[in-house]
């Protein structure tokens, strides 16, 4: 498999996981990263990449709280 093919697959996985996160937040409201990681049941690095995607696109708000992060959807 070429690097491009690997990268395309990874982008797809990040996008799908970002969608799962968005739907979870839409149904459950504000959650901590720990709660989200348990609910989504994907590798943490993939969840972090997907959160980065959503944050960069302006879809979520991340706030550091002690040793965790609070995550919520940005409601316009």
Regions found by a protein language model. Give the residues of each.
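Short, cationic-aromatic polyanion-contact patches
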Residues: 3-18, 32, 64-76
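A short, conserved structural fragment
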Residues: 55-65
């Amino acid at each position: 498999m070429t690097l491009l093919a690997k990268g395309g697959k990874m982008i797809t996985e990040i996008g799908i996981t970002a969608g799962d996160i968005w739907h979870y937040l839409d149904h459950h409201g504000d959650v901590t990263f720990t709660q989200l990681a348990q609910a989504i049941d994907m590798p943490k690095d993939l969840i972090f990449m997907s959160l980065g995607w959503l944050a960069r696109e302006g879809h979520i708000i991340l706030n550091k709280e002690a040793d965790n992060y609070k995550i919520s959807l940005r409601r316009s």
